């Protein structure tokens, strides 16, 4: 089972925000996640990002692969 760290879309039409989740790579975009890691709200200025660093490190140690967007959000959070 390959695990990915990726975004799932939440919110209303034209008012999206995203949860950052660990999910099986074969699961659909808004499918049931293995674990919630944080959230990303691009609708506010500046964009709001909250990521649980301990959970990210746990999943990366287990071999999870973040998507490009999630990788960039993690880097921003750490800086």
Curated annotation (Swiss-Prot):
Family: Belongs to the bacterial ribosomal protein bS16 family.
Protein keywords: Ribonucleoprotein, Ribosomal protein
GO molecular function, one term: structural constituent of ribosome
PANTHER family hit by this protein: 30S RIBOSOMAL PROTEIN S16 (PTHR12919), SMALL RIBOSOMAL SUBUNIT PROTEIN BS16M (PTHR12919:SF20)
GO BP of this protein: translation
Short name of any one Pfam family annotated for the protein: Ribosomal_S16
Domain of life: Bacteria
Record keyword Membrane present: no
Disulfide bonds: none
Name this protein carries in UniProt: Small ribosomal subunit protein bS16
GO cellular component, one term: cytoplasm
């Amino acid at each position: 089972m390959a695990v990915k760290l990726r975004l799932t879309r939440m919110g209303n039409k034209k008012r999206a925000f995203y949860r950052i989740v660990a999910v099986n790579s074969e699961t659909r975009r808004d499918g049931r996640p293995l674990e919630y890691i944080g959230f990303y709200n691009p609708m506010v200025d500046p964009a709001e990002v909250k990521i649980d660093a301990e959970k990210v490190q746990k999943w990366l140690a287990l071999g999870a692969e973040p998507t490009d967007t999630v990788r960039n959000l993690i880097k921003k959070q750490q800086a």
